[in-house]
Curated annotation (Swiss-Prot):
Acetyl-CoA binds at V85, Y86, V87, G93, K94, G95, L96, G97, R98, N124, S133. It comes from Escherichia coli (strain K12). This is L-amino acid N-acyltransferase MnaT. One of its GO terms (molecular function) is L-methionine N-acyltransferase activity. The keyword Transferase applies. Expression leads to increased levels of N-acylated L-amino acids which could be used in a number of applications. Disruption phenotype: Cells lacking this gene show a reduced growth rate and a markedly reduced yield in glucose minimal medium compared to wild-type; this phenotype can be partially rescued by adding L-phenylglycine to the medium, which reflects that other enzymes may also catalyze its acetylation, but with lower affinities. The deletion mutant strain also shows a consistent change in the level of several metabolites whose masses can correspond to L-phenylglycine, L-pipecolate or N4-acetylaminobutanal. SUPFAM superfamilies: Acyl-CoA N-acyltransferases (Nat) (SSF55729).
């Protein structure tokens, strides 16, 4: 298994992983699936913004993906990113999520980001545990802010401070 930067050719596999999460889990709070063109547009927007899209790969097959983007679009949030990590269901439980997220944290630090945010459906114990094990702390619980599969969903926000800067725009 290897982790590498995604290529446009990976977007069909990324769409497949995304769509499985849409159809069968509460990890993505969308009801509509996407096609490869949608993921290509997403990929191009991320890379144009200077943000990484990573994939895990085994024997030439994309088994997961991870990325981060702006947490909010206002200038004051420029040092904060929100991430996503998804693993193909056939490859879950093998530590790929941990490897992808660990690499993504390194990429965020390399980009000079200060905080990484995770928005996690509050019943997703595997994701909550993974994030906690990598140093994320719970910062907010938001009951019944979403809905999927005919039920209310609660949202847990977690965050990881990526550096020790005391001044927001200090270099080094």
């Amino acid at each position: 298994m290897s982790i590498r930067f995604a290529r446009k050719a990976d977007c069909a596999a990324i769409a497949e992983i995304y769509n499985h999460a849409v159809l069968y889990t509460a990890a993505i709070w969308n009801d509509q699936t996407v096609d490869a063109d949608n993921r290509i547009a997403w990929f191009e927007a991320r890379t144009l913004a200077g943000y990484p899209v990573l994939v895990s790969e085994e024997n030439g097959v994309v088994t997961g993906y991870a990325s981060f983007g702006d947490w909010r679009s206002f200038d004051g949030f420029r040092h904060t990113v929100e991430h996503s990590v998804y693993v193909h269901p056939d490859h879950q439980g093998k530590g790929l999520g941990r490897k992808l997220l660990s690499r993504l944290i390194d990429e965020a630090r390399d980009c000079g980001k200060h905080v990484m945010v995770a928005g996690i459906e509050s019943q997703n114990q595997a994701s909550l545990h993974l994030h906690q094990s990598l140093g994320f702390v719970v910062t907010a619980q938001m009951p019944q802010v979403g809905t999927k599969f005919g039920r209310w969903l609660d949202l847990t926000f977690m965050q990881l401070q990526l550096d020790e800067r005391t001044e927001p725009d200090a270099i080094g």
